[in-house]
Swiss-Prot record:
Belongs to the AdoMet synthase family. It comes from Acinetobacter baumannii (strain AYE). Mg(2+) binds at D18. This is S-adenosylmethionine synthase. GO terms for biological process: one-carbon metabolic process; S-adenosylmethionine biosynthetic process.
Amino acid sequence: MREYAVFTSESVSEGHPDKMADQISDAILDAILKEDPYARVACETLVKTGAVVLAGEITTTANIDVEAVVRQTVNGIGYHHSDLGFDGSTCAVINMIGKQSPEIAQGVDRQKPEDQGAGDQGLMFGYASRETDVLMPAPISYAHRLMERQAELRRSGALPWLRPDAKSQVTFAYENGKPVRLDAVVLSTQHDPEITQTQLKEAVIEEIIKPIIPAEMFHAATKFHINPTGMFVIGGPVGDCGLTGRKIIVDTYGGMARHGGGAFSGKDPSKVDRSAAYAGRYVAKNIVAAGLADKCEIQVSYAIGVAEPTSISINTFGTAKVSDELIIQLVREHFDLRPFGITRMLNLIQPMYKQTAAYGHFGREGSNTAFTWEKTDKVEALKDAAGL
């Protein structure tokens, strides 16, 4: 397959309306999991001027103050005053959440936990490559870091005129499958009305972009598009409606890898849309970290109510040191990809999800309590089994 000559990925800030919705959904999930680790949660959020609307299906013994969780989340993002067009303390919160269908529950729940069926049919992908030190594609990795930097400078007061809503887009030129130079950066950020566009552009380039992207990636023809439409004072849910699950490419690999179509936020680990995508990243990252391949994409698929995956496929794009067939065999031997196995393997029944809902679910620092799918604790076992 021909390699891309250039590749572009985008990210959005925590104050982008779609990401607000994701964070609210995951904040509710976390609050429930604190009281009921085995709850069934599918929480969807819509945000628009002056209102947060919740819908979905939740079955739980937890008793949480949903409205308080919503308000705390919105205020924490930075929408805490009417001057910003949205105030978490005064916005309407409309709760339309119901219970999960018993027909779904009978297909998922089992007497033996290991036999837990998948919560739905579907296909999920995981990916890793040696482009960056976190084994992620460079465009999405740097796009996320730019948005984190924008939030850091906003929260610290270093650039006090910044507001919560922002977007980034990064284009790298590639040679022999590796990023070699920065072709273009697009960064649009909401701001106070007093700041001039000249001041804004200089600050964004010098204080946000240059500290994040390695100096050797810049070249004379690198293009900067900073707030290219000019003023960006009206933003967040006033400017656009936000919905849970509308940034699935931002959440994953920036388009560099395939996507099965299922969103993550607001879903408990019994939903393989989320848990199997996390497991796919865990598998692919350990394969690349172990040196079995320089690039790896895995696809897994499921049938509702069935524990074992209906398929496991691997693509190493010609970079493998062993056969793809051997890698699939090693995946089956070293990774339990049944829904319960994934939850146990990655310690997913814990309230850690809100922090995943902005700046990407992958390429973050992994630990035993957060982003567990980023750990590379299978490397030695894979090396030994592959004879490397």
